[in-house]
Each structure stands twice: as C-alpha cells, then as structure tokens.
C-alpha cells in the first residue's frame, strides 16, 4: 500500500493516487495516523496538481465511512441542498431559505451544513438566529425528518473524525480537498442533491463524483457571476446526473420567465441580516430574495423528482411561498428541534 511519502511524490510529479491507495491514505489522515506536517504537504500537493474525480470519490467514500449516520426510512423525494461555500459573494443563505420552500412543496430535505468559514453567515449561523436547535443527535435529526420533512445535520456532530484534520486545515488557511468533500458526504445518504460549487471546473467534476458515489439525481451548479447557487445575475453552468447519464448545459433566468437582476442586493454583513432577508423571501415580500429563492427551491424540487422540470419546480415554489406554507414549515421545524433541548 502507498506510503505518505510516495503519495507526496506522486502529487509533486502530477501523477494520480489510485482509488485503493487514496482510501488507505484518507483513512490514515482521518485517524490522525499521519503527522500534521505530512498531511498538510499531501493536501497541498493534491490541490496544486488538481484532485481527480477518482481521488475525490475515494476521499468522499472514506468520510462517509467515518460519519455518524442519520436513520431515514422513506427515501423518496429526498434531497440535499448544499453549497461548497467559498464563492466570496457574501450573500444571504439562499440554499437554507430554499430548503423550507422545497419542503413545503413536497420534498424531504436532509441539509448538511456548518458555521461560516469564508462567508459572513453559514447555514448553522442563520438557523440558530432563527431559533433552530442545531445540536441534535443523528437519531433526533431522523425524527425531525419524519415529523417535518426537514433535517439539519451540523457537520461537527456527524463527522467527529474531522477533529484530527481541523487544526491542520485551520493553520494552512487555504482551500483543500476537504472544501469539496463536505457536500459529498451527507450523513443521511440523500440520493438526490442540488449542489452549488465555487469554481466552474467543479461542475463537471462533482457531478461525476456523485455518479461514482451512486447518486440518483444530482444537479451541480455554478453561477457565472461567481455564485455557488443558481444565479439571477448571470447564466448558470449546470452538470446534471439523471438516469445514470451526465449532461452539462447552461441555464438563464429568462428561460423561466425571470428577469436577470444583479445579486448585489443579496449581500449581508452577518447572520442577523441573513435571517431578515431569508424571512423576506419566505413571507412573500416582492424583491430579489424571493425571486432567487423561488429559482433555487424550484431547481431543488426538480432534483428531488417532485417537479418534472425546473420551470414546474419554480411554479410549485412560488405557490408554497404565496400560500404561507414555506413560513409555516420554518415555524414547524423550529418547534421540532426545540423539543430536544
């Protein structure tokens, strides 16, 4: 089996670390069996040579092995809405707002998230600001999914082995393979996913990684204005896995009868501002927040196979917002999480 030194040499020579070797290497890193210096060197080497689909798939497989799983009985219309973050756009939590709308329209959501690292407000930060208890056990998350159709999995609770890697990542302070592994390692094993990424190259890579990991319907998006969401301010690159086949294409707001609007008005300074904008969208206040949430929730409903198309999904999302069902879903979710305090 490959040694850490051999793995580093491969990276320096821009050669691939093969699947079984990567499994072995990642298990060692996750268990703290490789020194911090060597682990940091390998993570840097992988980034410089550019991680391959095979390397990312193997690394994600190991993270899933080490995760505390969430028990879910009914997996139909079950979807994760997640972003890699790191897009530098500092917008409000669009995917978190979209989760309540999609759930109100019939999807089941298993959202996997954390506190903000590069963003002003991570999904965990805004959910806490809304009154959600994020410190649930895997069993309690499963119960929330049963009761409300939504589960939020706070990453540190579900990935305890990351404690061996966290200090290394923090000291390095640069992007590593772990930045793209989070969205691939849903502890509830959601078979469908809407994933936003921070770089156009990742669209084709991540959708093919999801294919290798056995996803059913995966939609990976990158807004050409730099957003890790479906954008209103520019075209969005899409990688879609459906029925075992991968397609890559572009979508535009106008395709769905939406006006192209700059995302500048979506920027926030902290979790409190993000909460206010999220509530605007859910309570049907006309404006860009409501429009971008309708677009992303609609795409999530298509990914969850609740809607036949993104257009159909947007229509369902708008209905969920206008009827008050999305706001009620948020209130229901807050109550469900608070019962475990």
Curated annotation (Swiss-Prot):
The lineage of its organism: Bacteria, Pseudomonadati, Pseudomonadota, Betaproteobacteria, Burkholderiales. One of its GO terms (cellular component) is cytosol. It comes from Cupriavidus necator (strain ATCC 17699 / DSM 428 / KCTC 22496 / NCIMB 10442 / H16 / Stanier 337) (Ralstonia eutropha). Keywords: Amino-acid biosynthesis, Aromatic amino acid biosynthesis, Glycosyltransferase, Magnesium, Metal-binding, Transferase, Tryptophan biosynthesis. Belongs to the anthranilate phosphoribosyltransferase family. GO terms for biological process: L-tryptophan biosynthetic process. This is Anthranilate phosphoribosyltransferase. The gene is trpD. Binds 2 magnesium ions per monomer. Its EC number is 2.4.2.18. InterPro entries: Anthranilate_Pribosyl_Tfrase, Glycosyl_Trfase_fam3, Glycosyl_Trfase_fam3_N_dom, Glycosyl_Trfase_fam3_N_dom_sf, Nuc_phospho_transferase. Pathway: Amino-acid biosynthesis; L-tryptophan biosynthesis; L-tryptophan from chorismate: step 2/5. Mg(2+) 1 binds at residues 95, 229. Homodimer. GO terms for molecular function: anthranilate phosphoribosyltransferase activity; magnesium ion binding. Anthranilate 2 binds at residue 169.
């Amino acid at each position: 089996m490959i040694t850490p030194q051999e793995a580093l040499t491969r990276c320096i020579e821009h050669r691939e670390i093969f699947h079984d070797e990567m499994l072995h290497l990642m298990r060692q890193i996750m268990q703290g069996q490789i020194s911090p210096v060597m682990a940091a060197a390998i993570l840097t080497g992988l980034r410089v040579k550019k991680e391959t689909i095979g390397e990312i798939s193997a690394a994600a497989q190991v993270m899933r092995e080490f995760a505390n799983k969430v028990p879910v009985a009914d997996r139909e219309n079950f979807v994760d809405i997640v972003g890699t973050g790191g897009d530098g756009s500092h917008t409000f939590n669009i995917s978190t707002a979209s989760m309540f709308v999609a759930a109100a329209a019939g999807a089941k959501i298993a959202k996997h998230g954390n506190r903000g690292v590069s963003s002003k407000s991570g999904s965990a930060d805004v959910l806490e600001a809304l009154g959600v208890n994020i410190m649930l056990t895997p069993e309690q998350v499963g119960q929330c999914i049963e009761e409300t159709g939504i589960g939020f999995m706070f990453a540190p609770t579900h990935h305890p082995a990351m404690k061996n890697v966290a200090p290394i990542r923090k000291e390095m302070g640069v992007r590593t393979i772990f930045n793209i592994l989070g969205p691939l390692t849903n502890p509830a094993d959601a078979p469908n996913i809407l994933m936003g990424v921070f770089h156009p190259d990742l669209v084709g890579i991540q959708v093919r990684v999801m294919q290798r990991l056995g996803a059913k319907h995966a939609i990976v998006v990158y807004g050409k204005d730099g957003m890790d969401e479906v954008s209103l301010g520019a075209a969005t690159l899409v990688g879609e896995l459906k029925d075992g086949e991968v397609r890559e294409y572009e979508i535009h707001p106008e395709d769905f009868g939406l006006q192209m609007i700059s995302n500048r008005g979506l920027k926030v300074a902290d979790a409190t501002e993000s909460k206010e904008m999220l509530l605007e969208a859910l309570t049907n206040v006309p404006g860009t927040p409501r429009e971008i949430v309708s677009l992303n929730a609609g795409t999530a409903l298509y990914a969850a196979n609740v809607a036949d198309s993104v257009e159909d999904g947007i229509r369902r999302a708008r209905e969920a917002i206008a009827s008050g069902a999305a706001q009620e879903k948020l209130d229901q979710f807050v109550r469900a999480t608070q019962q475990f305090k």
